[in-house]
């Protein structure tokens, strides 16, 4: 008994294998091409259901699904498969595959090895390897409109279609006619959305139709985005894309029709598997023979019995009559419409002498009939996402306040320019530094302002020129201090402001040249950017963009600023030996560079990490404000504080001496030895040598035990008094006896007693 069961199982397995083979005894291979993914819950999903149904009925193991659309993409993807694999049957489901599949059929019609047969959308003649199929899309849309006319409560219905050039609006006309036949009072509105699959446009267009009062909305789209939008508003809807929506959404679907592609594809696939090349086309429609009936109709419990009965009566009428005499081909509106739009009426005789059009003329219907309200192509308007107005106002107000403070500082410098604290720092260069800060502030206001090509260029020009002016003036004026005080030979040096102006100008000229290159070759302009940051699909933001040449130039500008900062570091390090606080700005420069370095330490990781444009702008502008404001405060607060502490009317050249550096001491000692020569030179020495040795060193430590120490200290202080006044004159370019910095040896007793040098360690 067990042996008999084993034999029966083997026989069944063999029969199953034989059924999977075609007439030549090889495995049957089938491919279906889809224009979109099967999860559209519409046309493509139902096509795939047809493939599955054929595969089950014919027990096809190698049944593939390929998503591709368009002639070129279809050729590129499918042809290698045809050449390298023995494919028997290809179903080209979409009109986007038609041209490519016809090309394959013609190319391989008499090919010795490629015996593939192709099933394409159309109604033309068949060949040995080309079969065409179609379905009556007019009849299902006519019946959907018929239902809409029966069910509407507002007498307003709507429709969505792809529209030309994808497809003419003949199907829209069929829907409208169905409603018009049963409800002459109907008002009809429709949109084109540009494609069979455009959920964004269909959702927005559906909302518009709902706002117009439409309570039933149909469509000829591939997906169910319109129906989902309607249900999200709390309404029930109809399913008009060939998918049995009631299976998913239940009683929210008032009415739907579903395609049964298995009934259409199965006879054709059986013929191909049997090796028959005398092919005939396939067509899907309402049919009295249920095995051939292509459409399955379903209703919700909310639909009245009267509506269902009238629907069934009309469907029976369509099944019982030739489709060429159906109402959408033959009605009283056609004569006037065809005449107006240069279309032809059918000349074929019909029953009861009906006035009709043929199918080719039907497909040319596109302009609306009287009573159809065409709302046009629904274009989704792009929405600009603007920079936050509150942030923009915050930056602008803050920067405006800082500009006002900076202007007050400039006025203060002019007012107190005669005070030692200001005179020693070169007032004209102080104002240059402040002017550079104002330019940077203006650039930041432009940076957060409305975006345009002009503002994209202006903000870079302003910010770079501002920093060049600020940093360049700071470096150049302190370069003069270094040259005067870092003087091992203790020679008299005169450097006027007019001699320094070209150096500041050179810093600006370099900046201008680099920015001119960026402007000319960088193609810096404002563009409307989409798909950036967290923007929606139909949102855009105005941003500044430059090409690679512009980016390279910008990096060069940044390198130039880095070099300028390095020079500033060098100068600040060199002037650290200056013992007079008014002339020593090494601390201010160092603190400014520290602030810049701190910002770079924070900003670089932030800029490298993903940032949206608004966050990037906030970071850059905040950094620019901080660097500029910190630099100005670090440089100018001590100066104004000294003016406040000493008094605005202080006429004394009252310098503060800080603790001497070891470098200054060493240089002073070297200078003293070179200038004294021997003991006989006594008290007559170079005055600048004396001031360096006396004011910039701590000689009390090196001369302990000298019985004349107190007298020497007095002599050095007196010499320092005269030379300090001379040095101050060099920084102000004022006409005086010391402007040329050339001093004759005079007796110490001749020094003016009003010039005082204070030791900062003993003077608070």
Curated annotation (Swiss-Prot):
Basic and acidic residues biased stretches: 707-719
Glycosylation sites: 72, 260, 278, 344, 379, 547
InterPro entries, per database record: GPCR_3_C, mGluR/GABA-B-like, PnrA-like
Subcellular location as annotated: Membrane
Membrane recorded as keyword: yes
Superkingdom of the source species: Eukaryota
Gene Ontology molecular functions: G protein-coupled chemorepellent receptor activity; G protein-coupled receptor activity
Gene Ontology CC annotation, any one: plasma membrane
Regions of compositional bias (Low complexity) in chain numbering: 671-690
Main location (coarse class): membrane
Regions of this protein lying in the Extracellular compartment: 21-393, 449-464, 522-552, 609-617
Similarity section: In the N-terminal section; belongs to the BMP lipoprotein family.
Name of the featured protein: Metabotropic glutamate receptor-like protein H
Naturally occurring in which organism (per UniProt): Dictyostelium discoideum (Social amoeba)
Gene responsible for this protein: grlH
């Amino acid at each position: 008994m067990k042996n008999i069961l084993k034999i029966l199982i083997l026989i069944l397995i063999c029969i199953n294998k034989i059924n999977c083979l075609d007439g030549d005894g090889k495995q049957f291979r089938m491919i279906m091409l889809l224009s979109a993914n099967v999860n559209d819950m519409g046309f493509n999903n139902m096509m795939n259901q047809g493939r599955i149904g054929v595969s089950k009925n014919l027990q096809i193991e190698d049944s593939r699904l390929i998503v591709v659309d368009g002639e070129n993409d279809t050729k590129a993807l499918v042809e290698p498969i045809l050449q390298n694999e023995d494919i028997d049957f290809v179903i080209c489901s979409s009109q986007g595959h038609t041209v490519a599949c016809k090309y394959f059929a013609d190319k391989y019609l008499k090919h010795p090895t490629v015996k593939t047969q192709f099933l394409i959308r159309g109604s033309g003649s068949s060949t040995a390897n080309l079969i065409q199929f179609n379905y009556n899309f007019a009849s299902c849309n006519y019946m959907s409109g018929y239902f809409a006319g029966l069910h509407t409560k507002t007498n307003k219905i709507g429709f969505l279609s792809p529209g030309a050039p994808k497809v003419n609006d003949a199907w829209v006309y069929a829907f409208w006619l169905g409603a018009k036949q049963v409800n002459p009072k109907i008002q009809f509105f429709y949109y084109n959305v540009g494609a069979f699959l455009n959920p964004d446009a269909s959702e927005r267009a559906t909302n518009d139709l709902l706002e117009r009062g439409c309570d039933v909305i149909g469509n000829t789209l591939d997906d169910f985005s319109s129906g989902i939008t309607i249900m999200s508003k709390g309404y029930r809807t109809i399913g008009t894309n060939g998918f049995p929506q009631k299976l998913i959404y239940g009683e929210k679907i008032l009415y739907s029709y579903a395609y049964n592609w298995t009934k259409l594809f199965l006879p054709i696939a059986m013929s191909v598997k049997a090796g028959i090349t005398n092919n005939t086309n396939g067509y899907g429609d309402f049919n009295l023979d249920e095995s051939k009936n292509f459409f399955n109709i379903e209703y919700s419990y909310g639909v009245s019995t009267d509506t269902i009965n009238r629907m069934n009566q009309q469907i029976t009428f369509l099944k019982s009559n030739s489709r060429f005499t159906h109402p959408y081909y033959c009605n009283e509106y056609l004569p006037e419409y065809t005449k107006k739009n240069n279309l032809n009426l059918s000349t074929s005789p019909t029953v009861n002498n009906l006035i009709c059009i043929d199918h080719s003329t039907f497909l040319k219907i596109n302009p609306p009939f009287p009573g159809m309200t065409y709302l046009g192509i629904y274009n989704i308007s792009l929405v600009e996402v603007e920079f936050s107005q509150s942030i923009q106002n915050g930056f602008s107000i803050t920067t405006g306040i800082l500009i006002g403070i900076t202007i007050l500082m400039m006025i203060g410098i002019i007012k107190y320019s005669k005070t030692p604290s200001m005179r020693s720092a070169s007032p004209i260069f102080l104002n240059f530094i402040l002017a550079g800060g104002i330019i940077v502030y203006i650039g930041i206001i432009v940076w957060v302002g409305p975006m345009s090509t002009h503002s994209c260029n202006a903000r870079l020009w302003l910010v770079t020129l501002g920093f060049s002016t600020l940093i360049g003036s700071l470096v150049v004026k302190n370069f003069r201090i270094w040259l005067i005080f870092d003087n091992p030979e203790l020679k008299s040096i005169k450097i006027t402001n007019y001699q320094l102006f070209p150096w500041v100008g050179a810093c600006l000229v370099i900046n201008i040249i680099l920015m001119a290159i960026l402007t000319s070759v960088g193609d810096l302009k404002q563009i409307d950017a989409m798909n950036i940051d967290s923007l929606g699909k139909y949102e855009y933001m105005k941003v500044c963009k430059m090409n690679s040449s512009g980016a390279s130039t910008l990096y060069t500008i940044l390198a130039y600023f880095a070099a300028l900062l390095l020079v500033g570091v060098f100068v600040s390090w060199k002037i650290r030996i200056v013992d007079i606080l008014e002339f020593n700005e090494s601390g201010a420069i160092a603190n400014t560079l520290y602030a810049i370095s701190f910002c770079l330490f924070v900003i670089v990781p932030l800029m490298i990490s993903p940032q949206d444009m608004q966050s990037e702008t906030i970071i850059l502008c905040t950094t620019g404000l901080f660097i500029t404001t910190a630099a100005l405060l670090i440089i100018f607060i001590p100066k104004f504080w000294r003016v406040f502490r000493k008094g605005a009317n202080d006429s004394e050249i009252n310098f503060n001496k800080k603790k001497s550096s070891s470098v200054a001491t060493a240089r002073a000692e070297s200078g003293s030895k070179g200038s004294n020569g021997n003991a006989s030179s006594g008290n007559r020495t170079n005055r600048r040598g004396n001031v360096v040795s006396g004011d910039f060193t701590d000689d009390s430590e090196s001369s302990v035990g000298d019985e004349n120490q107190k007298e020497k200290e007095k002599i050095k202080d007196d010499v320092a008094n005269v030379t300090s006044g001379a040095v101050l004159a060099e920084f102000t370019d004022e006409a005086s006896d010391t402007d040329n910095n050339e001093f004759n040896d005079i007796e110490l007793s001749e020094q003016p007693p009003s010039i005082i040098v204070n030791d900062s360690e003993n003077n608070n």
